[in-house]
Every structure is written in C-alpha cells, then in structure tokens.
Amino acid sequence: DDPTSTFTCPGGSDYK
C-alpha cells in the first residue's frame, strides 16, 4: 500500500 494515500486512525487501524 502507498503510505502517501494511507493514513492511520487514532484507533490504530489503517484506512485507505
């Protein structure tokens, strides 16, 4: 997955 198009929620789960 491209880290530039992915962000981490405060819960710790990664979403596109």
Swiss-Prot record:
Primary location: secreted
Keywords: Cell wall, Disulfide bond, Secreted
Localization of this protein: Secreted; Secreted, Cell wall
GO cellular component, one term: extracellular region
Source superkingdom: Eukaryota
Family indicated by similarity: Belongs to the thaumatin family.
Name of protein: Thaumatin-like protein 1
Organism listed in the record: Taxus baccata (English yew)
